[in-house]
C-alpha cells in the first residue's frame, strides 16, 4: 500500500500539541485592524485550539501528524 500524502496547505496552517489537540492562528488578523480595539487585537494575537467537530477532518489531511 502506498504512503499517504500530507496536505501541504493544512501542514502550514495547523500544528499538533502533545495531547493531539490542534493549534491554529486566529482569524481576522490580516488587515483592517484600525477599527478593532487593542483588547481585541491582543486576544487575536495568540494561537487557539481547533474545535472538536473539525478535528477529524484535519487529521485526515495530516495522517502523520497524530501521535
UniProtKB/Swiss-Prot annotation:
Source organism of this protein record: Leptospira interrogans serogroup Icterohaemorrhagiae serovar Lai (strain 56601)
Protein name: Large ribosomal subunit protein bL35
A Pfam family reported for this protein in Swiss-Prot or TrEMBL: Ribosomal_L35p
Keywords: Ribonucleoprotein, Ribosomal protein
Family stated for the protein in its record: Belongs to the bacterial ribosomal protein bL35 family.
Gene Ontology cellular-component annotations: cytosolic large ribosomal subunit
Biological processes, Gene Ontology terms: translation
Gene3D superfamilies according to UniProt: 4.10.410.60
GO MF annotations in UniProt: structural constituent of ribosome
Originating gene: rpmI
SUPFAM superfamilies assigned to the protein according to its UniProt record, in alphabetical order: L35p-like
Amino acid at each position: 500500500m502506498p504512503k499517504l500524502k500530507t496536505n501541504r496547505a493544512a501542514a502550514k496552517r495547523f500544528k499538533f500539541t502533545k495531547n493531539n489537540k490542534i493549534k491554529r492562528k486566529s482569524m481576522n488578523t490580516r488587515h483592517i485592524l484600525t477599527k478593532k480595539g487593542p483588547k481585541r487585537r491582543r486576544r487575536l494575537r495568540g494561537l487557539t485550539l481547533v474545535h472538536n467537530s473539525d478535528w477529524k477532518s484535519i487529521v485526515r489531511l495530516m495522517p502523520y501528524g497524530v501521535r
